[in-house]
């Protein structure tokens, strides 16, 4: 069992983009930015418990940080991990919410 503290550290933020919006509408898939050391099992458990939905599958990828230059100095952005979480039929996560 994963501790509650770890569950809260696994999911960092929802990743909102054109591609993720299309995926949400067509495939019932939500995209999250997750901790770089998070496993698929941890992501699945975190989404299921935090949002109270049933998760079908989780696909992950690591985006490599780009090299950036400012004047004569060069630096590198951090690597980060993204998770595509497919929800069960009929399940939905509303990030926008808003007053009705």
Swiss-Prot record:
Protein's UniProt keywords contain RNA-binding: yes
GO biological process per UniProt: translation
Keywords in alphabetical order: Ribonucleoprotein, Ribosomal protein, RNA-binding, rRNA-binding
Description of how the protein assembles with itself and partners: Part of the 50S ribosomal subunit. Contacts protein L29, and trigger factor when it is bound to the ribosome.
Stated family: Belongs to the universal ribosomal protein uL23 family.
Function: One of the early assembly proteins it binds 23S rRNA. One of the proteins that surrounds the polypeptide exit tunnel on the outside of the ribosome. Forms the main docking site for trigger factor binding to the ribosome.
The protein's name in its UniProt record: Large ribosomal subunit protein uL23
């Amino acid at each position: 069992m994963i501790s509650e503290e770890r569950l809260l550290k696994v999911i960092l933020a929802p990743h909102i983009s054109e591609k993720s919006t299309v995926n949400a509408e067509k495939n019932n898939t939500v995209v999250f930015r997750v901790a770089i050391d998070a496993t698929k099992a941890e992501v699945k458990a975190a989404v299921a418990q935090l949002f109270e939905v049933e998760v079908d599958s989780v696909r992950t990828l690591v985006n490599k940080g780009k090299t950036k230059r400012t004047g004569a100095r060069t630096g590198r952005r951090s690597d980060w991990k993204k998770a595509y979480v497919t929800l069960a039929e009929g399940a939905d996560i509303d990030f926008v919410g808003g007053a009705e």
